[in-house]
């Protein structure tokens, strides 16, 4: 209830007065959405201790149907595929610590992420749409060399890489400038925030 009230208060009055959501199919009909973006991330796998990362990425969302799961409202469904790169600056190399070696030090890390999601879109007003994206992501992390010491105070090699798979979920919204270009913002896991521009030819 509180969340709904906050969202309602923050949503533009013009959008709240619009009844676009009540008209199934009344939205831009495109085959694919291409969305380059900037992103803010966190260390999502337990081998890396923490901190905030910055990077760039892109999504390609392939439309499956312009009439979504609920036939009485204006919604659509797509499959989203992505590639993101994130860089983290030198916090402690906790992946050694988590593996029982007691390693502390300062190294940087680079992550590549490959999200695969179902994108469920809701067209709530003439210029506004929102979406949810459940799915999974494949990640690969590469950790640079650094001055790391184990629990005994002995210098050890902090260079390391690993690959894994994890659950993913995002919520987001778009402001549609027209039928082919929109500003897109996304919040969720594993990325905290993405901001990009969607092209829908």
Question: What is each residue range found by the language model?
Answer:
Residues 47, 85-109, 140-163:
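Flexible, solvent-exposed loop segments that connect beta-strands
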Residues 1-10:
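Bacterial N-terminal signal peptides
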Residues 19-20, 27-30, 82-85, 155-201:
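Predominantly the C-terminal beta-signal and adjacent terminal strand-loop region
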Residues 39-47, 65-67, 84-92, 138-145, ...:
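Sequence/structural signature of outer-membrane beta-barrel proteins
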Residues 30-32, 50-56, 75, 108-114, ...:
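Residues that define the transmembrane beta-barrel architecture of outer-membrane proteins
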